[in-house]
Amino acid sequence: METRREERIGQLLQELKRSDKLHLKDAAALLGVSEMTIRRDLNNHSAPVVLLGGYIVLEPRSASHYLLSDQKSRLVEEKRRAAKLAATLVEPDQTLFFDCGTTTPWIIEAIDNEIPFTAVCYSLNTFLALKEKPHCRAFLCGGEFHASNAIFKPIDFQQTLNNFCPDIAFYSAAGVHVSKGATCFNLEELPVKHWAMSMAQKHVLVVDHSKFGKVRPARMGDLKRFDIVVSDCCPEDEYVKYAQTQRIKLMY
């Protein structure tokens, strides 16, 4: 028998067939329930829709090994804890780069709404989160859309990215390894990540503890490329010693 939660999610799916996104307030009005009820529906269990930046969007599905819908429901509180720490690094009037990934929207959410800042991103989900910040000037880089991770891969970096030198770049990664460095699942993410590594003044890697010791197919770079590594808890001694040797600040 279909539960009320399943029925509501089914209605949201039908609505998202007509539109690429649905604001939380509009969804609540459509279903005749509170916004908190919808938040609970989407947070309690994995669902084919997800709430990002105040908008309900359909989870992108493809043959990729890395699906946002699969990752989003994992270690939510741990990601949120790391994200809150990372957000404390933001100061007024800075220009910031935000990577793709399921931790990044939590960083944006944790930034004080009174702080004015400029943001550069290449992920649809990241952009939707930035839209909710009242004093954010957001730039979404265009290019070829990849549904598996909801990013736009730029065709010409001269169009937008090369006009920026971010104060801070916030990166996500699916793997963190002492010798292999920071890695992710998708090769198409690398051009923008590498651009940020060459142009930003400060580099901050934000990962939950499950990423340590993992190696994924696409290599971002050595860990020593990052000034700060933020996580939800202290990593193993191997990483602590490496950070001390390379003068990388650990935040947890």
Swiss-Prot record:
It comes from the Bacteria. One of its GO terms (molecular function) is ligand-modulated transcription factor activity. Residues 5-57 form the HTH deoR-type domain. The keyword S-adenosyl-L-methionine does not apply. Keywords: DNA-binding, Repressor, Transcription, Transcription regulation. Residues 22-41 bind DNA. One of its GO terms (biological process) is regulation of DNA-templated transcription. The keyword Thylakoid does not apply. Pfam families: DeoRC, HTH_DeoR. Homooctamer. This protein is one of the repressors that regulate the expression of deoCABD genes, which encode nucleotide and deoxy ribonucleotide catabolizing enzymes. It also negatively regulates the expression of nupG (a transport protein) and tsx (a pore-forming protein). The inducer is deoxyribose-5-phosphate. This is Deoxyribose operon repressor. It comes from Escherichia coli (strain K12).
